[in-house]
A protein has these predicted regions:
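Conserved SAM-binding loop
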Residues: 8-101
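Class I SAM-dependent methyltransferase Rossmann-like catalytic core
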Residues: 1-9
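S-adenosyl-L-methionine-dependent methyltransferase catalytic module, highlighting the catalytic core
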Residues: 77-78, 88, 92-201
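Residue-level marker of positions within ordered structural domains that often coincide
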Residues: 1, 27, 125
Length: 201
């Protein structure tokens, strides 16, 4: 792991909470420091996300986001443990990944996992999980999942017909999301799913 942008060192020395973008590529998104494996323009920290984020101290991050990155990470549970370590109590986490119903997700040979409605509930205390309970014994890392938003693919014929109705109702509650994932997701597939979370410490 190598910090390329001196402003990261300055903010850390001043105790200013960082805002980081995991797997940013060269996008350079606003006031977020980009972290990526490749030293591209806009990347502030070069790191292999399958390795510990050793240069970032505990509780040094106030906001973390990641878009279409985690599906490429083989050490997913270990990375989430690192995310938990570096994000401060009350820090905001936003993760966007392809939903498992996205047919294009299976074509990419660099994708090593798929995500659904319940994926991050494996990091949530059983008593705080909605609906179907999932095991939590794989890790002691805990998060609260405050929001989940499913974005439908607009390119399919079924979605073009159903999209206006589904868009209004799909994300109105976890119950409607679960019903869609259980019964409709293969007919009306999603493009991506976004989770809003905070670490539990």
């Amino acid at each position: 792991m190598m910090i390329l942008d001196r402003r990261v060192h300055i903010d850390l020395a001043a105790g200013k909470p960082l805002r980081i973008d995991l797997g940013s590529g060269g996008a350079g998104r606003g006031d977020y420091y980009g972290i990526d494996f490749v030293d591209l323009p806009g990347v502030a920290i070069q790191a292999d996300l399958n390795e510990p984020l050793a240069s970032l101290p505990d509780n040094s991050v106030g906001a973390l986001r990641s878009s279409h990155c985690l599906e490429h990470i083989s050490g997913f549970i270990a990375l989430m443990k690192e995310v938990h370590r570096i994000v401060m109590p009350g820090g905001q986490i936003e993760i966007t990944v392809p939903h498992f119903s996205n047919p294009y997700g299976y074509s990419d040979p660099t994708h090593v996992r798929f995500f659904g409605l319940y994926t991050f509930n494996y990091f949530v205390e059983t008593s705080r999980q909605p609906a179907r309970k999932v095991p939590t014994f794989y890790t002691d890392t805990r998060f609260d999942v405050g929001s989940i938003h499913i974005s439908l693919m607009k390119r399919t014929l079924v979605n073009k017909v159903l999209y206006p109705t589904l868009r209004k109702n799909l994300n109105s509650s976890f119950v409607t999301q679960e019903r869609w994932e259980r019964t409709l997701c293969w007919s009306a597939p999603a493009d991506e799913i976004t989770y809003g979370m905070t670490p539990v410490k």
